[in-house]
């Protein structure tokens, strides 16, 4: 059964930009290069946002975001995480860190201390396994797959702790027009508002323009 499952999920060939890749090494390099190009930043141009009047945090809120990490804060974030997710390159699931917290907490807190003092971490900490999940049966083109990254447990924990800190203040700096990814707001509200706008135009026999953008935010 395991061998059959592996055969069904193996990727012997793939089409990238209209070109078929069949050799294992070519498939690996082709996929890696495609996503590297997709996710790379154009260093020649950056948007100038200095003239925008953006909401900002108070000095106290900014300082709170940069406080040293406490054991209670890290442990609380760890216990909130789903322990059953697939392990990353380090081979440890989140459940391992949860169950063995009393034994590993000193080393983990030392990692958080180094990160706080140096504002950086070892490159190996966020090493990932890139896994392609087919969006439909018979997927052949790279666009027919959805990539997911299997991250190590410690990197997930670090991200969780930082996210918990940001939750406390993010509502102050995110526009009230954004409905997604903010606690207390529902993405469905945006669809309802769009329908109301279209309905209003039709009733008043007015013309309008709606722009649907497939975009995402990033933090540099």
What is each stretch, according to the model?
Residues 126-127, 171-178:
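A short alpha-helix capping/helix-loop junction motif
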Residues 39, 43, 116, 166-170, ...:
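Structural signal for hydrophobic packing residues in well-ordered secondary-structure cores
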Residues 12-15, 85-92, 141-150, 189-220:
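Conserved catalytic palm subdomain of right-hand nucleotidyl-transferase polymerases, strongest
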Residues 1, 89, 134-136, 153-154, ...:
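Residues immediately flanking
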Residues 92-100, 178-185, 212-218:
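Conserved short loop/turn motifs at secondary-structure junctions
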Residues 143-174, 192, 216:
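Conserved pre-motif C helix in the palm subdomain of viral-like polymerases
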Residues 33, 76, 110, 160, ...:
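Short, contiguous clusters of charged residues that form electrostatic/catalytic patches at enzyme active sites
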Residues 1-143, 157:
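Surface-exposed loop/turn segments and immediately adjacent short secondary-structure elements
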